[in-house]
Curated annotation (Swiss-Prot):
A single GO cellular-component term on record: chloroplast
Pfam family, one: TIM
Database matches in PROSITE patterns: TIM_1 (PS00171), TIM_2 (PS51440)
Pathway stated in the Swiss-Prot or TrEMBL entry: Carbohydrate biosynthesis; Calvin cycle
UniProt protein name: Triosephosphate isomerase, chloroplastic
Listed transmembrane segments: none
Catalytic activity: D-glyceraldehyde 3-phosphate = dihydroxyacetone phosphate
Entries under Gene3D superfamilies matching the protein: Aldolase class I
InterPro entries: Aldolase_TIM (IPR013785), TIM_sf (IPR035990), TrioseP_Isoase_bac/euk (IPR022896), Triosephosphate_isomerase (IPR000652), Triosephosphate_isomerase_AS (IPR020861)
Organism: Spinacia oleracea
Keywords: Calvin cycle, Chloroplast, Isomerase, Plastid, Transit peptide
GO biological process, one term: reductive pentose-phosphate cycle
Additional record remark: In plants, there are two types of TPIS, cytosolic and plastid.
């Protein structure tokens, strides 16, 4: 196949544009929106046959929507490209000794090379996620990791659509959606990331960008069972800046409303929508109090066992607020 012959540089060369709806606050207007990440459609034409083989032939009818999870608070730790065998041994030891609230689904996403080490040494109920996966079955795709390989290592989840994959690697909405569909069809849960750039927020395009990203997932997914949506404003990731509780809640409400109108009311009410973007032990409680924030996707703070435990246990703030 010609999939791997297209360079990442060529994927991010020429801007495409799309006609869509812009939201400023909650008011709607129509405009022509230029994509913030310029990509070439040829990349997706090259993989189109692979998409059809790996996803479309296995899709359930769009009218069939399976309900998502348990409704528990959900906290994921994205370790990104960090750690050594020694530091991860210490981090896992801290997690094993931490007291974590029972009413929380806890997931950690180590780098690929440490998944087996983490899986074999965790003693509690913490589940394992991958940070990415290939769009279909394994084969001649140098450097990629298949969902089947992740399952073989014991991964229950995979993070897809993270802003660093979108804006650094150049992955497009359609490509991400197809990866999510394949993972779900293989029985791996998806943490589906969405979020806007700073210039998009300042231009009043926050909702529009998030809706486009959601639509790409909705168009591809066989169901919303085992899907967690993670809203991560790009301007807040790793910057120390964090959306205020009100800002985060506003977007979470809008995301849930979009799911209600475009997927189903049941999916909207069942799907957990979590927040990510410089979440730490100091701000997690106030964020957790927001009605539509169902948990967190944590970056840097997840590399510190005690602080990550504090974030997991912020579910108590939600219980008090309720």
């Amino acid at each position: 196949m010609a999939v791997v012959s297209t360079s990442l540089a060529s994927q991010i060369t020429n801007p495409n544009s799309a006609v869509s709806t812009q939201f400023s606050g909650l008011r709607r207007s129509f405009l022509k929106l230029e994509n913030s990440v310029s990509t070439q459609s040829s990349f997706f034409q090259n993989v189109d046959s692979h998409l059809r083989l790996s996803s479309s032939s296995r899709r359930c009818p769009r009218g069939v929507v399976a309900m998502a999870g348990s409704g528990k608070f959900f906290v994921g730790g994205n370790w990104k490209c960090n750690g050594t065998k020694e530091s991860i041994t210490k981090l896992v030891s801290d997690l094993n000794s931490a007291t974590l609230e029972a009413d929380v689904d806890v997931v950690v996403a180590p780098p690929f090379v440490y998944i087996d080490q983490v899986k074999s040494s965790l003693t509690g109920r913490v589940e394992i996620s991958a940070q990415n996966c290939w769009i279909g079955k394994g084969g001649a795709f140098t450097g990629e990791i298949s969902v089947e390989q992740l399952k073989d290592l014991g991964c229950q989840w995979v993070i897809l659509g993270h802003s660093e994959r979108r804006h650094v690697i150049g992955e497009q909405n359609e490509f991400i959606g197809k990866k999510a569909a394949y993972a779900l069809n293989q029985g791996v849960g998806v943490i589906a990331c969405i979020g806007e750039l700073l210039e998009e927020r300042e231009a009043g395009k926050t909702f529009d960008v998030c809706y486009q990203q959601l639509k790409a997932f909705a168009d591809a997914l066989p169901s919303w069972d085992n899907v967690v949506v993670a809203y991560e404003p790009v301007w807040a990731i790793g910057t120390g800046k964090v959306a205020s509780p009100d800002q985060a809640q506003e977007v979470h409400v809008a995301v849930r409303d979009w799911l209600k109108k475009n997927v189903s009311e049941e999916v909207a009410s069942k799907t957990r929508i979590i927040y990510g973007g410089s979440v730490n032990g100091g701000n997690c409680a106030e964020l957790a109090k927001q009605e539509d924030i169902d948990g967190f996707l944590v970056g840097g703070a997840s590399l510190k066992g005690p602080e990550f435990a504090t974030i997991v246990n912020s579910v108590t703030a939600k219980k008090v607020a309720a």
